[in-house]
Amino acid sequence: MALIKVLTGVRRCGKSILLEQIKEEFIENGFDRAHIITINFEDLQFEKIRTAEKLNSYVNEQIKDHDKYLIFLDEIQHVRSFEKVLASFRATLNCSIFITGSNSKLLSGKMATLLVGRCVEFRIMPFSFAESYEYATAIGRNMSPDEFMIDYINWGGFPLRF
């Protein structure tokens, strides 16, 4: 049984973007798209999936065989008792689970207790000044380091700014 991969970090730091990049990496390496289940709980399409039971039903309806599945759950904190269904998926399905969500809810008391030893946390941080400058230069935003420092002080290292 694989550990649940938990991406945490402040709002807008790039967790959802990173989750999508991880999924794309699997696809580029030949993982079957039909065996990837992706749910963004901030998408109205999934508005009715707000309980562990409904999430369990939805995911199990998507599974068609015993091959390995990848399950990507973005903003999982919108699902009540999500920690129970994650533990169930991990115990009963041939899958690898990746989740994102609010720092304050993902690894708080109840989830931490139910999933202790079953998950690994990856703390996602906004870009540092050096990372922001390197990326800005790579995409053609030519500024001197001093000019960019003013920009960085105003906007920070959040990926959306690019």
What are the residue ranges of the model-derived segments?
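Phosphate-binding site recognition
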Residues: M1-F162
